[in-house]
Amino acid sequence: MARRTWLGDILRPLNSEYGKVAPGWGTTPLMAVFMGLFLVFLLIILEIYNSTLILDGVNVSWKALG
């Protein structure tokens, strides 16, 4: 028999929807938007690291971190 804990009681409502599937596409478009925004974020970080995005007055060398 599983022991009841206060953390389990708090998290139980999150698990009450287990196994249920939203009809149609559900939240897929929202997820796609956030994935696109995350991709843009990663591209900006890559461009800063690769110095293809020039930021005046910002030194991006490893020596500047030390």
Curated annotation (Swiss-Prot):
GO biological process, one term: protein stabilization
Phenotype of gene-disrupted mutants: Not essential for photoautotrophic growth, however PSII is less stable, a considerable amount is missing the oxygen evolving complex, and it is missing PsbX.
Cytoplasmic side: 2-27
GO CC list: photosystem II; plasma membrane-derived thylakoid membrane
Keyword tRNA-binding: no
A family per Pfam: PsbH
UniProt subcellular location: Cellular thylakoid membrane
Gene3D superfamilies named in the record: Photosystem II reaction center protein H
PANTHER family (UniProt xref): PHOTOSYSTEM II REACTION CENTER PROTEIN H
Complexes and interactors: PSII is composed of 1 copy each of membrane proteins PsbA, PsbB, PsbC, PsbD, PsbE, PsbF, PsbH, PsbI, PsbJ, PsbK, PsbL, PsbM, PsbT, PsbX, PsbY, PsbZ, Psb30/Ycf12, peripheral proteins PsbO, CyanoQ (PsbQ), PsbU, PsbV and a large number of cofactors. It forms dimeric complexes. Part of a photosystem II (PSII) assembly intermediate complex PSII-I; crystallized from a strain deleted of psbJ, it forms monomeric PSII before addition of the oxygen evolving complex. PSII-I includes 3 assembly factors not found in mature PSII (Psb27, Psb28 and Psb34).
Family classification: Belongs to the PsbH family.
UniProt protein name: Photosystem II reaction center protein H
Organism for this UniProt entry: Thermosynechococcus vestitus (strain NIES-2133 / IAM M-273 / BP-1)
Gene designation per UniProt: psbH
